[in-house]
Amino acid sequence: MGAMIVREVFEIAEKIKNMEIRGAGEIARAVAEALKIQAEKSKAKTSHELWKELKEASKILYNTRPTAVSLPNALRYVMYRGKIAYTSNADLESLRYTIINAAKEFIYNSEKAIERIGEIGAKRIEDGDVIMTHCHSKAAISVMKTAFDQGKDIKVIVTETRPRWQGKITAKELASYGIPVIYIVDGAARHYMKMTDKVVMGADSITANGAVINQIGTALIALTAKEHRVWVMIAAETYKFHPETMLGQLVEIEMRDPTEVVPKEELETWPKNIEVLNPAFDVTPPEYIDVIITEKGVIPPYAAIDILKEEFGWAFKYREPWED
């Protein structure tokens, strides 16, 4: 008999897949929550059955979005703690408690991290700064909002972020805090870089050499900023750092549906020899980045490897906890 997976796990997996739940932090908290619900609602009679269900649930969640490293890192955080309990012969209720607790702890820490990044990053923002941002990053917004709440006079240039327009979400959110916003098309980033003092963006993943994987368009903005000698700050929680890259694995860049770029009805009328490509992310090399702001402090990109060793060093002694 197969493992009994609760409905909520499938619902959360589906929402991550179709981007109803989006943004690395939101995705990470959602998968931790899914494991918590699986543990709470499980009808398992033994710790062996519950562990089997948790592994199955983890696999379902793991396969939803290939690039967002926050997703496997959240699963690792919860499941490694579960694995230690399970392999030390924990009984059913102890294992359940371990998983629920680890999930709550992960969610709490990840919310606190955003606040802390705001406090640390705001120190780098000066009164009168014009800041450019791209896509929608809770960590980047936290830096700008904290600086504004400290009474610094800032203005933010927001790129629309095609094809899914995450810039609209960012622009409205910043404006709701009272921050003056300029909203521009992605192609205008270089034109407005001359009036920009700092670039503050988030990250989906950060590799061992300090390269940043983020929403498509991030690398172009960072390149333009470097050309104009404008400071580039990446705001990211430590669970965005990608442990597998220490072992030389390359990050897979997710390709999304062409109909996000050209509506289906229109695409069907196009000549067949036009191929529409829609990569979700690009890679910004570390030399285009001045600092990475984490909840543990400000680091230069080349120190990413130190964060990885500190946070995930243990991960290399084992296989993934949901693998057999």
Swiss-Prot record:
Membership in a protein family: Belongs to the eIF-2B alpha/beta/delta subunits family. R15P isomerase subfamily.
GO BP, one annotated term: pentose catabolic process
Catalytic activity annotation: alpha-D-ribose 1,5-bisphosphate = D-ribulose 1,5-bisphosphate
Pfam name, any one: IF-2B
HAMAP family with a match to the protein in the record: R15P_isomerase (MF_02230)
EC numbers, comma separated: 5.3.1.29
Keywords: Carbohydrate metabolism, Isomerase
Additional free-text comment from the UniProt record: Reaction proceeds via a cis-phosphoenolate intermediate.
Free-text function comment from the UniProt entry: Catalyzes the isomerization of ribose 1,5-bisphosphate (R15P) to ribulose 1,5-bisphosphate (RuBP), the CO(2) acceptor and substrate for RubisCO. Functions in an archaeal AMP degradation pathway, together with AMP phosphorylase and RubisCO.
SUPFAM superfamilies: NagB/RpiA/CoA transferase-like
Residues holding substrate: R22, G23, A24, G25, R65, S137, K138, A139, K240
Protein name as catalogued: Ribose 1,5-bisphosphate isomerase
Active-site residue numbers: C135 (proton acceptor), D204 (proton donor)
Top-rank taxon: Archaea
A GO molecular-function annotation: ribose 1,5-bisphosphate isomerase activity
